[in-house]
Amino acid sequence: MPISVDGAMRSKIEAVLKGETDRKVESFLIDANREFVTDYTDVYENFLRGLINDDVPTLFHCTAGKDRAGFAAAITLIALGVSKADVINDYMKTNDFTQERIEEIISQIELMSLYQADAEILRPLLGVEQIYIETAFKTAEEQYGSLENFIRVGLNISDADIKKLRNKFLEG
């Protein structure tokens, strides 16, 4: 996903780690999920168009494979007709599959800082919280009336495109 995590985000996270701000790491991810809807519709439109039009397997990811890629997976599932509740449940399974790796990262950060850094502060950055995806969904619903309308209007994906996507990926 060509959505960069800029230096400003890194400096904000460093400020949290150093205790230079009261802002919580979670707030950065809430903001990012809102911005997927408000600022990156072109990226997600291109992503869905690739799924619709390309006849090759698709591998998509981002740094941790949960935020930018998680939203891409979520809107794909919505376009395929999966319920919002099921999409959220699927999104939350990310934590089940990454828990062991998250614990390793927390331990490495603590060790590398000689136990001077409170690596637990970063835990929300390493996993997912329901509020992250719900923020994206709520933003889409507020701006477009529904998630389906966000896909149709916000991402410029026609009913014919959605039908093609469903024919390609669904059986029956």
Task: Give each language-model segment a name.
Residues 64, 68-69:
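Ser/Thr-glycine-rich phosphate-binding loops at phosphate-binding pockets of nucleotides
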Residues 1-59, 72-172:
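Cys-dependent protein tyrosine phosphatase-like superfamily
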